[in-house]
Amino acid sequence: MNTSAPVLTADQAEAAALIEEWFYHLNTQIFVLCGYAGTGKTFLVDYVVRDMGLVPGESAVFVAPTGKAASVLIRAGVPAGTVHSLIYTREEDIEVDENGEVISERFLRFVKKEKIDSGIRLIVLDETSMVSDDVLRDLLSFGVKCLCCGDPAQLPPVGGSNTLLTMPVVTLKEIVRQEKDNPIVRLAERVRAGGLPRFGTDGCVEVVPRCECDRALREELFAKADQIIVGTNRTRAAVNREVRAMRGIPPEQLLPTDGEKLVWTLNDWSK
């Protein structure tokens, strides 16, 4: 064990002991670690991996279902990639000219790899709730132990199902000290407990009744917002149109203009 270990919460310490017991002594391939936002799942797993003498990115690989989720791990100091980049190859139809220059390329499908790096002893799967049972089955087919982490309150996979988080081995419940004042974490806790968000400003979160959110108020809120989270693609498109109109961008201007943020929707880590 690492003698200079950081201070863990009580449930983090319990989870760490169970994970190490599972990794060294149990034959089961999967360990399911659940935890709500702010409970320190990423911190705990990174600590446990290093405490067991594994090397993140080498003997222990961290993967997530999307590039966005993987980038969150990377920003936390954990080397990570997507599940698909680990276990699949991309099959493409590529057209070249007489000089061998690529004219066009069209993605066809993902094909499961025959094998992955033999030095991998542990796969850490983050955001497990978003991984379909089919992809999970492919991931487990390589026979490597898999530590599956996730938040049971998050979204299920698009067009699929995932039952892992309904049967966790251990669940982190205690919000770590540095997250207790996070207004988003507080709001999530309140909703999970069956309460309703309180209207008004809570830190950087502003909760507004739909019936009061007229155009003037939306303009005021949108002008100072760094990000706007919505529930559907339809609402997202409507909000984007409204914000662009507020900034004087004509509706026929479909391409991005200077200063607009972009969201890359295709995971292709080779480019």
Question: What spans do the regions from the language model cover?
Answer:
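Hydrophobic positions on the alpha1 helix immediately C-terminal to the Walker A/P-loop
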Residues: 44, 48
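SF2 helicase catalytic motif II
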Residues: 118-136, 146-154
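Inter-Walker segment of RecA-like/P-loop motor cores
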Residues: 61-118
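Short, conserved phosphate/pyrophosphate- and ester-handling motifs at nucleotide-, phospho-/glycolipid
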Residues: 12, 66, 232
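Conserved helicase motor core of P-loop NTPases
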Residues: 15-31, 39, 138-144, 149-271
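Conserved SAM-binding loop
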Residues: 8, 62, 228
